[in-house]
A protein has these predicted regions:
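Short, amphipathic alpha-helical "lid/cap" segments that border enzyme active or binding sites
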Residues: 12, 66, 92, 96, ...
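Helix-turn-helix
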Residues: 10, 14, 18-52, 56, ...
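Hydrophobic alpha-helical connector segments
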Residues: 56, 70-108, 164-168
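N-terminal intrinsically disordered/low-complexity leader segments
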Residues: 1-6, 70-79, 157
Length: 198
């Protein structure tokens, strides 16, 4: 058996491929070790338990689905620098990109979204949820950044009682509801955004 050290990222890459081809149930320490051509102990060097491995794999899948290429990271935008190119021309462009990524994610990882609807298995649910929340945090932050950079939004759209953060949270909740329902048609959300912001 090849016992050379394998990086955590390489193991997670194999786990993503397993989820894609064999489904969620294929993620266990022994099977992952076999597919990585490493010892079971080597997997435990990076993951304390099966729960830890599954939670990290789920977070890794979400990061793969919503990975911003280097030139499309909204958090790298400096709103005080007008010369810096913006990644999205408008907030609806950003939401369209998210829906497109969800659709591609469903195609790349068939059945993955259904796992979230079912809540995974009970003993792993909390840890997976916490890591999923962390991996989604950057999406919510990105929505806020894009809102603040969209020069076409009405000047009176936001105030101290209804902030960009509040609106981003509402839109994110609608996006999550759409993904749970496997509804990747964002037309109604776009209509709401246009009526409220422009």
């Amino acid at each position: 058996m090849n016992t050379t050290i394998t990086s955590k990222d390489e193991i997670l890459c194999v786990c993503r491929e397993l989820i894609r081809k064999e489904g969620y149930k294929s993620i266990n320490i022994r099977h992952v070790a076999k597919c990585c051509h490493i010892s079971v102990g080597s997997v435990y060097n990076y993951f304390e338990s099966k729960t830890d491995l599954i939670a990290e794999t789920v977070a890794s899948v979400w990061c793969d689905i919503f990975h911003f290429p280097d030139n499309r990271n909204p958090e790298s935008d400096n709103p005080d620098s007008p010369d810096e190119s913006k990644i999205f021309q408008s907030f609806p462009d950003c939401v369209a990109w998210i829906f497109d990524r969800l659709k591609q994610g469903e195609e790349k990882y068939p059945g993955f979204f259904s796992l979230h609807s079912m809540g995974f298995i009970e003993e792993e649910k909390m840890d997976v949820q916490e890591r999923m929340d962390r991996s989604w945090f950057h999406i919510r932050q990105s929505l806020v950044v894009v809102l603040k950079n969209d020069a076409n939004i009405r000047s009176d759209a936001f105030d101290e009682n209804f902030t960009e953060e509040d609106f981003a949270e509402i839109i994110f909740s609608l996006i999550l509801a759409s993904f749970v329902q496997h509804d990747f048609d964002a037309k109604r959300i776009f209509n709401m955004i246009r009526k409220m912001l422009y």
